Amino acid sequence: MKSIILFVLSLLLILEKQAAVMGQKCGSKGQLPSGSSQFPRGQKGQHYSGQKDEQHTKSKGSFSIQHTYHVDVNDRDRTQKSQQYDLNAQHKMTKSKQHLGGSQELLNYKQEGRDHDKSKDHFHMIVIHHKGGQAHRGTQNPSQDQGNSPSGKGISSQYSNTNKRLWVHGLTKEQASASGAQKGRTQGGSQSSYVLQTEELVANKQQRETQNSPQNKGHYQNVVEMREEHSSKLQTSLHPAYQDRLQHGPKDIFTTQDELLVYNKNQHQTKNLNQDQEHGQKTHKISYQSSRTEERQLNCGEKSVQKDVSKGGISIQTEEKIHGKSQNQVTIHSQGQEHGHKENKMSYQSSSTEERHLNCGEKGIHKGVSKGSISIQTEEQIHGKSQNQVRIPSQAQEHGHKENKMSYQSSSTEERRLNCGEKGIHKGVSKGSISIQTEEQIHGKSQNQVRIPSQAQEHGHKENKMSYQSSSTEERRLNYGGKSMQKDVSQSSTSFHTEKLVEGKSQIQTPNPNQDQWSVQNAKGKSDQSAGREQDLLSHEQKGRHQQESSEARNIVITEHEVAYDDHLTQQYNEDRNPVST
């Protein structure tokens, strides 16, 4: 009995080896065994399968060999490791029904059938032959159909030329033949299809037991257990169809992810740009300065001269340096001279503007200023949450500069904070104006509401603050005596300076209603009276500033100067003023 059993086992092993050798030869040469027809080569991505069943009756069992032929033509995706099968292929229904009954039991006895009792079981062997173009790599993947064969030893189910994915848009692929799991495949939809990789290279009595992923069991009822053993070429995986919808596989997926990342970055950058480009942005802030602007901070005495400012415009600069959350809204209505320079047509600063902060005595001379311009620059340096809303209707040209204060001053106004004696001289001022300075250094919560209608020409230049300075305005902070002279100013303007050093939450609302008359203009050239009034205003302003600095609360110093020629100014004010409500 033992000799008979050994003889039968040896015959079975010989037959399996022969079948494997025949399968390899047929697959590599592109030849099909007798009994099968030659398949056409002109259809790319189509599978043709034929079956050849050879029954070898033995003493205690039967042995059947099933051949499945796949014909492929020159597919560039043959380097990929997956083949996708059509879940809705109607011509494969007959093949799937052949093995629905016994596939579960065959898979349950798969382990025992490969190692033990080979003469007592019904052996079912699947040989998949692939006919097609050349293969670049020999990535082999065991099939789920191979799990139906208890005698999987020595069975060749894939060769080097079968390493391709057959993929057609909108359709799923042809299913593997002679599989009990095809019941689930034929009932599935095209969008929920799975890519079944059914390639395996078996040689020289190597046992390969593959185990598919758990999602296989959810869709394929006949897959019980498949394990993978010691084979670098043995790859079994069921990928969802959406992962393999791309023809170029993981490369396309990674490329798509990279594009999505780039798109997200671009979207983020675009969002930031749109936030800044309400007033136009050039380099992380909006800075539009026509011909020449100089900002200097000097430790020693220096002379600043501004000459021949021909025409002004409107300049809006917005910069946010915020550590918390802030909202910055700037609404500007102007009727002065506007012309587009650079981007978004919102930058027009006078040809040469100099801002200087001096520690020692210096001399500032402003000459030949013909016209001002309008410049609005907004910046927030806030460590908490703040809302800054500035609404500035302007009719004439205003040039304002702000540093740590709110200041309404004419084109020939200087602000100084002196520890020692200082002399302020204003000469040759043709037209007077009104100067208001307000400074807040607040560590709590504050609200500042200032209503400022302006008629003169405004030019706002701001560095880390909101500023509106005339074309010939200097601000100086001197520790020692200094001298300032302003000469030959043709037109006056009004500058508004506001700064809030806030560590908590703050709100700045600066509407500019056209209610009160803040600007004094003299069309007939009464320069001596203007100079005298302005000198008084500055002295009064210094007093108000010292009182303001003593108390760290809301300090708004408003100085109004009644003029003797009020009727003439009122008439001129009404003529020059075109109210714009925001």
From Swiss-Prot:
Subunit comment: Interacts with SERPINA5.
Primary site of residence: secreted
Compositional bias annotation for Polar residues: 31-40, 137-159, 325-335, 379-397, 439-457, 487-496, 506-524
Signal sequence annotation: 1-23
Cysteine pairs bridged by disulfides in the record: none
Keyword Repeat found: yes
Keyword annotations from UniProtKB, A to Z: Repeat, Secreted, Signal
Pfam family, one: Semenogelin
GO terms classed as biological process: coagulation; negative regulation of flagellated sperm motility; sperm capacitation
Compositional bias ranges of the Basic and acidic residues kind: 336-345, 525-552, 559-582
GO cellular component, one term: extracellular exosome
Physiological role: Participates in the formation of a gel matrix (sperm coagulum) entrapping the accessory gland secretions and ejaculated spermatozoa.
Subcellular location: Secreted
Family, similarity comment: Belongs to the semenogelin family.
Name used for this protein in its record: Semenogelin-2
Residue numbers spanned by region Disordered: 26-65, 132-159, 272-295, 318-358, 379-417, 439-582
